[in-house]
Regions:
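Acidic-enriched catalytic cores of C-N bond-cleaving enzymes acting on peptides and small amides
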Residues: 1-64, 90-110
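Generic non-transmembrane alpha-helical segments
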Residues: 99-108, 130, 134-142, 164
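Short acidic (Asp/Glu) and glycine-rich catalytic loops that position anionic groups and cofactors
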Residues: 38, 77-82, 110-117
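Hydrophobic, well-ordered secondary-structure elements that form the walls
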Residues: 83, 135, 161
Length: 172
């Protein structure tokens, strides 16, 4: 339904940075995340690329029907789902909401009310920006190993700095 049409692919440099930042102990990462394998049985690096470059729709919660003690043989007349979107560069919150509505309508659920309670567009900062280079230099001077993540999974409100009207770089 067009969910991926404005997703900008990772550049060769972004892939290089992601590969360099990959934790060495894949099994420890799986343990922390509570998984036995990566989606579609992909290798660790491919899954890392997917995590950094593809938007997601996450179900935060579902409520419907009778949830009290005992049983009831009634059909629920109402259901709620709380979602969050994790957007990537070149996508917008408005576009994501419209695509969700179109997806629902195409499947016969055009009467579902979609309430948007917040959110923001994705953000990123160039690797060569002053703030990123200053942070890297400070870590290096302190003898601290660091990695540059060209994209993180999900959005964060840094767009208030990196988006119009300021258009400044911001670390995350």
């Amino acid at each position: 339904d067009g969910w991926f049409e404005n997703v900008r692919p990772l550049t060769p440099r972004e892939k290089e940075l992601l590969a360099a930042s990959l934790p060495k102990d894949e099994e420890a990462v799986k343990k922390v995340l509570g998984v036995r394998h990566w989606i579609k049985d992909e290798d660790f690096l491919t899954s890392t690329y997917r995590l950094a470059s593809q938007p997601t729709v996450n179900i935060q919660g579902l409520v419907s029907g009778y949830t009290g003690p005992g049983g009831k043989t009634v059909l629920p007349g109402r259901a709620e789902a709380k979602l969050d979107f994790r957007l990537v560069p070149d996508m917008t919150k408005t576009e994501a909401v419209e695509k969700l509505k179109a997806h629902l309508a195409k499947r016969g659920f055009g009467d579902i009310e979609v309430i948007v309670s917040g959110g923001y567009s994705p953000t990123e900062s160039p690797e060569n920006s002053v703030v990123i280079q200053a942070g890297a230099a400070a870590l290096k001077k302190a003898g601290i190993e660091y990695s540059l993540f060209p994209r993180r999974a999900g959005s964060w409100p840094g767009v208030v700095f990196t988006g119009p009207p300021l258009k400044l770089a911001a670390g995350h």
